[in-house]
């Protein structure tokens, strides 16, 4: 989540949104960059939470939340009139974000616009053990999650896919994408990654501006995959994106039917393999019996 000053946009194009869902086991909580606090260039507080989710024994998806102190937060109220639903919002000073709706002088039908989290268990009125559900500003979610997350927790996560680019020291433009969670919840049952009957949930959905499709090749030999090229339109940037497909029939349909610069929605599975390397260590004799 980039620091957003909501300055006037340089172009008037609708943003293309992307979302994802994961179920798996938390990992990387012991890494140095798991949770960090700092300051922005303008002196505002910032927090970062970085962790992984193992969705298969050899597949890990990285997640990252970047959040900043803001002047205010917003509360939302839904009003239903017949089949029509309307929404009202009210801005609340940042320092008052933890106050109850009663303390803020709002009714019970108002709620904070924020991220959902359920990383603790509690017993409800029916005697059932359920997740303790909270709604927090992303800034507060990072700290709370860092205190309640642990490796190998079974979780369900959903959120937004963020894109951006930067220019490296060599002048080369580099693209990046980030899975930014808006919900982190414990699952009702423990997840066994080795269960062959388990249905893997590691999915994304992305609206994009289609530009081209081509067959992927290595050393001029087709790999069996096709690369879909497109543009992701953000609030203040337009970034390149690539998606891969293996369905040859669908690839032909894209090539013949989808015109360049059409707005399309793509979806599929997130596959990020865990890189491993076997290293041979020369035996120095330590620990061996005489």
What are these regions (language model features)?
Residues 1-290:
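OB-fold and OB-like single-stranded nucleic-acid-recognition modules
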